[in-house]
Every structure is written in structure tokens, then in C-alpha cells.
Amino acid sequence: DSAAGAVRAGDDETLLKPVLNSLDNLVSGL
């Protein structure tokens, strides 16, 4: 279970990073 949780956490991070980068770009564009 802990291994699966770690993988899920890693997936969440990789999915969130591009989103956060996009938000940063939008804020800089303002």
C-alpha cells in the first residue's frame, strides 16, 4: 500500500508541475 501511495503521490506531483508552471506564466503575462 505504501508503495502504491508513493507512486500516486509522484504522479500527482508530475501532473501538478505543468499546471503550476502554466499558472506562473499566466501571472507573469498579467
From Swiss-Prot:
Its main location: secreted. Signal peptide: none annotated. Expressed by the skin dorsal glands. The keyword Mitochondrion does not apply. It is found in: Secreted. One of its GO terms (biological process) is defense response. Keywords: Amidation, Amphibian defense peptide, Secreted. GO terms for cellular component: extracellular region. The modification Leucine amide is found at L30. Lacks antimicrobial activity. Does not inhibit the formation of NO by neuronal nitric oxide. Belongs to the frog skin active peptide (FSAP) family. Rothein subfamily. This is Rothein 3.2. The lineage of its organism: Eukaryota, Metazoa, Chordata, Craniata, Vertebrata.
